[in-house]
């Protein structure tokens, strides 16, 4: 029979594997197979079926009611401490911690002689904090919000990833309020634990239940999405970046203009403000007024039937539709590009005018107009950009953390 095992280890991500076994196979032999597949020691493996743990290692799988196609949950139990060795009265106990191990002991331990101690009462080991599977708490400081906050503030790369992948937690971190950060962190850990519990219940539920099938389908779909994004980030990280648009330098009626080259636009357009700067508003034919429809809608004031555009040393005739509220000054549409047989050469990063053979380069980001830049400076803006606000908040949070640390040392 074919059994599907959902593995939930302590320190790794969940995995799923299938085993083709006989119903007469004993549980202890099945645990050995699971150890080979998962890498978890058999002594730490706990098998759960129908929300009940399988306890008897000598019992056959078929006697537990397992059938072909069933789903089992493999959980990694906590390591059990070895019981303390009983002391024999009258015999001394040797302190093996003082024995130097070559290559690992410090200079103090090398020179320290072995000492015999009198029999003493065995002290119980200190209790260790145990975490339930899926709680999201790991030894890396997640159970200490203050330590985690200091680690993130000291690592700009991790902080940028946190702002991208977990904005609520990043916002709480940059606020400088430790209580708020702890609250958001605990809520997310509890939510993750709840989702893990629901996933375990889902895997042990009746596979023929319609609600269970719908949840399984959604789980598979979400897993495929995450896997697809992970592969994309590893194999093609450039697809997550942004590219600057294609702009060229030109002149309209002797006035310099930065024109946006858009082969997807049907007509060449110009903003009303740019038309006023170029002194061609007097040529606008308002009988051609209307509405321009694309991603949104904008009002067309009218049309300039003929004007002269200078690109490098060429003077080209062109017509414009004047838009009332347009952020970019000028857009060269397909009507202009086809009329002059223009070619966009991305390898050379130039626009080739086919009728004259003239080439003009596309502008780098530093020369683009303000509205087209991905990262622009603060000149000419009254309000700061979001990344500037985030940088300022980060600096303030680091300063508050340093002050809090200083107060704690003084106390």
UniProtKB/Swiss-Prot annotation:
Q: Where is the composition biased (Low complexity)?
A: 108-121
**Where are the stretches annotated Disordered?**
82-144
Q: Extract the Pfam families matched here.
A: Asp_protease, Ddi2_HDD, ubiquitin
Q: Does the keyword Transcription regulation apply?
A: no
Q: Which GO terms describe its molecular function?
A: aspartic-type endopeptidase activity; identical protein binding
Give the residues annotated as active site: 262
As recorded in UniProt, its EC number(s) are 3.4.23.-
Where in the cell is the protein located?
A: Cytoplasm, Cytosol; Chromosome
Q: What processes does the entry annotate via GO biological process terms?
A: cellular response to hydroxyurea; proteasomal protein catabolic process; protein processing; regulation of DNA stability; regulation of protein stability
Cross-referenced Gene3D superfamilies, in alphabetical order? Acid Proteases (2.40.70.10), Phosphatidylinositol 3-kinase Catalytic Subunit, Chain A, domain 1 (3.10.20.90)
Would you say which domain of life the source belongs to?
Eukaryota
Sequence ranges assigned to domain Ubiquitin-like in this UniProt record: 1-81
**Primary localisation category:** cytoplasm
- Subunit (UniProt): Homodimer.
**Which family does the record claim for this protein?**
Belongs to the DDI1 family.
Function recorded in the entry: Aspartic protease that mediates the cleavage of NFE2L1/NRF1 at 'Leu-104', thereby promoting release of NFE2L1/NRF1 from the endoplasmic reticulum membrane. Ubiquitination of NFE2L1/NRF1 is a prerequisite for cleavage, suggesting that DDI2 specifically recognizes and binds ubiquitinated NFE2L1/NRF1. Seems to act as a proteasomal shuttle which links the proteasome and replication fork proteins like RTF2. Required for cellular survival following replication stress.
Give the protein name, as stated in the record: Protein DDI1 homolog 2
Q: Which organism is it from?
A: Danio rerio
* Gene from which the chain derives: ddi2
């Amino acid at each position: 029979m074919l059994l599907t095992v959902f593995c939930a280890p302590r320190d790794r991500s969940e995995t799923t594997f299938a085993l083709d076994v006989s119903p007469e196979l004993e549980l202890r032999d099945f645990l050995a197979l699971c150890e080979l597949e998962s890498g978890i020691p058999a002594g730490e493996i706990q098998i759960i079926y129908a929300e009940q743990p399988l306890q008897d290692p000598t019992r056959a799988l078929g006697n537990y009611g397992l059938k072909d196609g069933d789903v089992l949950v493999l959980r990694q139990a906590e390591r059990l401490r070895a019981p303390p060795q009983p002391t024999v009265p009258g015999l001394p106990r040797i302190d093996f911690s003082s024995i130097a191990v070559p290559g690992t002991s410090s200079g103090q331990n090398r020179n320290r002689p072995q000492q015999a101690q009198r029999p003493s009462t065995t002290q119980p080991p200190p209790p260790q904090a145990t975490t339930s599977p899926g709680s999201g708490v790991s030894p890396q400081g997640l159970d200490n919000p203050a330590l985690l906050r200091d680690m993130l503030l000291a690592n700009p790369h991790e902080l940028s990833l946190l702002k991208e992948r977990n904005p609520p937690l990043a916002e709480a971190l940059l606020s400088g309020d430790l209580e708020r950060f702890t609250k958001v962190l605990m809520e997310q850990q509890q939510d993750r634990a709840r989702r893990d519990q629901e996933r375990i219940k889902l895997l042990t539920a009746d596979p023929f239940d319609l609600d269970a099938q719908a949840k399984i389908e959604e789980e598979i779909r979400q897993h495929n999405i995450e896997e697809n994004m992970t592969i994309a980030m590893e194999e093609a990280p450039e697809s997550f970046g942004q590219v600057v648009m294609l702009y060229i330098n030109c002149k309209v009626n002797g006035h310099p203009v930065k024109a946006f080259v858009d082969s997807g636009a049907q007509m060449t357009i110009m903003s009303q403000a740019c038309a006023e700067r170029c002194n061609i508003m007097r040529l606008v034919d308002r009988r051609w007024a209307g509405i321009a429809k694309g991603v949104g809608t904008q009002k067309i004031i009218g049309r300039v039937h003929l004007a002269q555009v200078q690109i490098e040393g060429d003077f080209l005739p062109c017509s414009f539709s004047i838009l009332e509220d347009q952020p970019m000054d000028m857009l060269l549409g397909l009507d202009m590009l086809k009329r002059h047989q223009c070619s966009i050469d991305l390898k050379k990063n130039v626009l080739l005018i086919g009728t004259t053979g003239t080439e003009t380069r596309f502008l780098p980001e530093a020369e683009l107009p303000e509205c087209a830049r991905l990262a622009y400076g603060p000149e000419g803006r009254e309000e700061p950009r979001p990344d500037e606000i985030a940088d300022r908040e980060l600096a303030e949070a680091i300063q508050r953390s340093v002050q809090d640390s200083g107060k704690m040392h003084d106390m």
